Swiss-Prot record:
InterPro entries: Carb_Metab_Reg_Kinase/Isom, Man6P_Isoase-1, Man6P_isomerase_Firm_short, MPI_cupin_dom, PMI_typeI_cat, RmlC-like_jellyroll, RmlC_Cupin_sf. Induction: Up-regulated by konjac glucomannan and by cellobiose and mannobiose, the possible degradation products of glucomannan. Repressed by glucose via the carbon catabolite repression system. Also repressed by GmuR. This is Probable mannose-6-phosphate isomerase GmuF. Transmembrane segments: none annotated.
Amino acid sequence: MTHPLFLEPVFKERLWGGTKLRDAFGYAIPSQKTGECWAVSAHAHGSSSVKNGPLAGKTLDQVWKDHPEIFGFPDGKVFPLLVKLLDANMDLSVQVHPDDDYAKLHENGDLGKTECWYIIDCKDDAELILGHHASTKEEFKQRIESGDWNGLLRRIKIKPGDFFYVPSGTLHALCKGTLVLEIQQNSDTTYRVYDYDRCNDQGQKRTLHIEKAMEVITIPHIDKVHTPEVKEVGNAEIIVYVQSDYFSVYKWKISGRAAFPSYQTYLLGSVLSGSGRIINNGIQYECNAGSHFILPAHFGEFTIEGTCEFMISHP
């Protein structure tokens, strides 16, 4: 495969969703409560599909199974990552995700979920929940039972451009007024701890998963802070956010024309802002804010022209 795979996202309506995915990127969203864009997804709950080339119309899940050469003949049976855009028009539930070992045992062999967030935009006084203040499981449980959420939850002020690494076992929640790009393990397993006593459209409170959450949550909280590393490569600024066992994440900021080498691994790309073109072997591939693509393994040397920002990730 010698060309990028551009992808058609899948959209998810959520109790807490809004219209920012349409307003910021021009997507045709299904409703005024659209919370998630599954941009690069091969998950059974919603697989994105290829928009261009001979594989157009195929789901990413199909391509992963039928064309391992695109991905460098990987060992795993499951596409490892999931890239989302999230419109937190309201607060998300306070939740936690299991690690691989727990999910394999208790969630039908699924992957665990370590994730990360890049804050694309947010309101002036925006915050998120990352971690808690309990020292022991007994204290954690007591604070839940007494409803002492203000005393339990660790709140952090945020601004556009912030990056957060959220390992499995970390209590967390996005809060209202936040537009986020999320890169995560390919999992849809969530254990809700607190949902603000909200009801869904049927007037029912959403299910909580306190028992499972207590089994997987990290107590006391461990803050995984990653200091970004900035590199200048010609007309590109490369910010290295994280290189972990699960994924590596970068931001490529292009101003003009920047040359890149051939990468042995495949790359997942999302255009955050601006517009540009990827040039390989004399062929140009246009991309704009809201475009999502996969560069195949051993794609070859390429150039990006334009004024744009990409979030790039790989396993």
